[in-house]
Amino acid sequence: FWARMATFAAIGLGGGAGRLLGGYIADRMGGTFLTMAAMGLSAVCALIVGFFYGGAPLLTFALCFIWGVAVVADSAQFSASITELAPKDRIGTMLTIQTSMGFLLTLTTIHLMPLAVDAFGWRYAFMALAIGPVLGVVAMARLRAHPDSLRLANGRR
């Protein structure tokens, strides 16, 4: 029972908090800043969460809650970037592709994680989940450095 409640809290409540906090930060500091910070935090959580396996449940929950906040905080920024940077006649198609790719990546990850756990154990399997956020930080940094990024969020990038 408690494991299910903790999962709901980390994903449902943490995710909700992440969306609100992410929007607030993005409005004030810019979407690329928020996205890089959220993905960086998500990568750190992925790198260390496996080492909490079998340890203190409250510490594990706290880390997973933080991860739940971070993992969704950037989601809206991708859609916002598309709507602000894409040619107007392609926005719908690009949003559809972006959303579909997100679901495909999530589905693939969910199915590959048991194989990673079997091969490497809980402590190390989660480390693979840091790859995506690290690459995302690099991609967002490149976007932030591009002149077109000034078209994002009224110039706040």
What are these regions (language model features)?
Residues G12-L20, T106-L107:
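Residue-level signature of mid-helix packing/kink "hotspots" within the transmembrane helices
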Residues G50, W122, A128-R157:
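Multi-pass alpha-helical transporter architecture, strongest
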Residues R19-G30, V117:
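Helix-to-loop junctions at the C-terminal end of transmembrane segments
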Residues M29-S81:
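C-terminal transmembrane helical hairpin of 12-TM major facilitator-type secondary transporters
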Residues E84-A119:
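A late C-terminal transmembrane helix in Major Facilitator Superfamily
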Residues F1-L13:
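Loop-to-transmembrane helix entry
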Residues L20-Y24, H111, V138:
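Residue-level hotspots within transmembrane alpha-helices of multi-pass secondary transporters
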